[in-house]
């Protein structure tokens, strides 16, 4: 039987069953039938079913580990610039609870099995497990699952981890352009993950390349270019067409057309893909715009763009937001770009920032290349004069220590041990 989880319709279904049974000469009480209906839907009682349905327009808790919700609260606090306490209250309210304590109590009950899993929770688990058969059964029974939202406003499509599950959800009516609380769509995920097959699937389903997430200008293309991805970008358009995009795409003509124009620094409200990166406020300072573009060219290994941007005034030692050009080139294994930047004046031992506030402060490029396991970049940096025994200012580690922290102890054959 297919159920539309609408309270009015559920009440009608219960009353219709009562009428049918009484017409057949059976004894039937509305309360008993409501309980029966609730049990069929996986709930212990009619009041629990009623409470669930009343909250369907809100975000549904679907994870049973409290740490997950703590992490989401931290993200809200970071993005909105509010206290953790305020972020927790906000998160609880999004789920229909009056306080953080109430949300924690509910999640704890889910964890202990005192709250039976709702249809959305069961569907989420099927998505996580890649169980297309089970998900199909749930969608057959509860077609409205495709429009329900979980924590952070993520729907089932947004949480789908493989193409089969994503395809099934699209077939059942999931909106390819529906974003979560931050505007993040599945096409943004394709850009972020450098996933061509997912991008093709979403584009074929009508996915738009011009939608922004986490700030104006945060298009799917920009999510890819933030990390220096190259394989997926030809599918994702060119929006928002500013200098960072031109640099990441390695388009010299576009760079020349943009430098010195307002469009060069336009649509740069987006600057981080998640709250793990610290807050920053991009400005319209032409020098900052140039310097940032050089970083984005280095991320993607666009050597012609690197040389052009330096010629136009970009600084090779600039650290506009969490990383110099050399840092990002090294982390991404862009060996030719590492050599190009040093030839243009970059200091291989410059101390810079990187990643989140607890990741890199006062750290040289070779340490980050070591953590990322980029052997060829490490060899190039050593050849160019990088000192692997410098200790970073935040953790006091050498390049070999960073390699081991990144599970790349095999790099001990090229990095000296300070002991």
Task: Give the predicted meaning of each segment.
Residues 139-144, 167-175, 201-208, 235-240, ...:
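Ankyrin repeat domain, specifically the short helix-to-loop turn at the C-terminus of the second helix
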Residues 111-122, 222-265, 269, 288-289, ...:
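Ankyrin-repeat-protein effector appendages
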Residues 194-197, 203, 210, 357-398:
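Ankyrin-repeat and related helical/solenoid repeat scaffolds used for protein-protein interactions
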Residues 125-130, 159-163, 189-195, 223-229, ...:
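Ankyrin repeat A-helix N-terminal signature
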Residues 116-125, 147-161, 179-186, 212-219, ...:
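Ankyrin-repeat boundary/"N-cap" motif
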Residues 136-142, 222-230, 265-281:
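Repeat-mediated protein-protein interaction surfaces in helical alpha-solenoids
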Residues 1-137, 141-142:
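Intrinsically disordered, low-complexity eukaryotic regions enriched in glycine, serine
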Residues 134, 164-165, 197-198, 231-232, ...:
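Conserved ankyrin/ankyrin-like repeat signature
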